[in-house]
Structure formats: C-alpha cells, structure tokens
Amino acid sequence: MRSKSWKMLVLVLALAVPSRAAAATADTLTVVTLNLWHDQHEWPKRLAVILAELRRLRPDVVCLQEVLQNPQLRNQAETLGDSLGCHVQFASVDGPERPKRYGNAILTPHRVLVDEERNLAPADDYRAVAHVRFAWRGREVDAYATHLHHTKAGGAIRATQIRHLVAYVDSTRGKGPVVIGGDFNCELGTPEMALMTSRYRDVSQTVHPHATRAEAATYNPLFEPDVGVIDHLFVESSPRRRVTPVACEVIFRTPAADSVWASDHFGLVGKIAVAR
C-alpha cells in the first residue's frame, strides 16, 4: 500500500511540473468586451463607473459595442480612450461625414501597427467589425470587435455575418494571437454559432465549463429577463497557436454606490496565456 501511495505522489508531482513550467513561459493578455448602451440612462454617470473599472483592470485591449457620437455627444470610445491613454479605432457603417455615427470600437494602450474596419453583409443590417493589430511583449496581436443582428428570429442573418467575420479575420490577421470580442446577440449552442465555435474557443466557457446560464449571463435580467450569454470573447482553437484562456470574469454585475449600472449588458474580462 505504501509503495502504491509513493508511486501516486511521484505521478502527481510529475504532472504538476509541466503546468508550472508552462506558466513560467507564458505572458498574460487581458481582454475586455462591453456593450456601452450608447447614451442611455445617464451616460456621464455610467462613464465614471466604466472608467473606474477599466483603470482597475488595466486591460491590454477593450472591445466596445453600441458606441455613439452625434452633435451633442463626443464619440464615446474617444472619451474613454483619452481618459485611459489608449489608441481608439472606431468602426461604423455611418461615414465620417455623417453627424451621427454608431458602431464598434477597440481601445489599446499599446503601439498600433494596423487599424481598419469592414462592413458586414447583409448591408441592410448596418453592422461592422473593427480591427486593430498592436505590438505586445515582442509579439503582434490582432483584435476584432463586432456586434451582430439583434432579433431572436434573425439567426440566418447572424450566420451570414459570422461567415463574413471569419473570412475577414482570415484575410487580415497576422501571425500572432487573435482575440475577438463582441455582442453576438446569441448563445453558443445556437445554429448560427456553429462556424464560430468550430474555429474559436469561447473564453468564458473554456474557463468555466460548468457555470450555470445565470452565472455566465452577460445581459442584466433587470432590463430583460432570460436573455442569457450573448456577449463573448473568443480565441483560436488551434493548439499550434499556444494560446490558452486561464481566467474569465463577468464584470459590472452590480450597480455602483449611487445605484447606477454601467450598462444594460454586463462586461467580460478574460485573461489569455500566450506562450513565449
């Protein structure tokens, strides 16, 4: 019996060594996604709540949706970016000459190598994707932010948008890690997500495979019940990329001290181990 116990201890220690070695040879990329809820419900107060949390988290990249600018409101992503010292890439189907523009954005404090955008098909759904490649710890990281069609019956529209999103990522990415954040307006098990989940790992689901739907939910049930997990962070599935989700947390799940919610959505912060 003593011999078996000793052999078991040796096996456990042997298995533990590679994990510690892997952790020592990886850097951690911190990624946030959040639907800003445009200018609804006291934006100046919500802005303060969002800024405080982002300063605490110090993410390497932030993916934003429902970003608004109009003659009365400065571009919300630019307001955040200036306060945080970040580069801002804003993507909108509304041209730069338009007084009102609405879309997605990416913020990063790191040196930007590429920033661009693409409108998603179908054109009459007015959806876009933002793309930034930035330098990070001796590597190049490609980040994408998007927001898909919103109706429950619109699965076919979302499927088309996902096909175009995946093709766009394939045609624009570099050789480093890829992260995709956004409001997909659907959960992982829906038919329209099949392509996405065949190519990418959902960070929250990977880290918390046994979380209940309520625990993982990203839409505030006070605003609409039973929406579930519609905001996602994705990284690649391919083992050769050596990218591993190691942590994920739902953020903005509680109101601030003055009862102000950051958004009608909760946000996600994921930590991704990237092998050196």
Regions found by a protein language model. Name each.
Residues 62-65, 89-92, 179-183, 202-206:
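Active-site neighborhood of phospho(di)ester-bond hydrolases with catalytic His/Asp-centered motifs
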Residues 133-135, 170-179, 186-276:
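Metal-dependent phosphoester-hydrolase catalytic domains
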Residues 1-4:
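N-terminal secretory signal peptides that target proteins for export/translocation
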Residues 43, 61, 65-148, 245-250:
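Structured beta-strand-rich core segments of catalytic domains in phosphoester-bond hydrolases
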Residues 7-18:
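Bacterial N-terminal signal peptides
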Residues 158-176:
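A long, amphipathic alpha-helix that forms part
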Residues 13, 21-83, 90, 96-100, ...:
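N-terminal, active-site-proximal structural segment of metallo-dependent hydrolase catalytic domains
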Residues 34-36, 66-67, 146-148, 182-184, ...:
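Active-site metal-binding loops of divalent metal-dependent hydrolases
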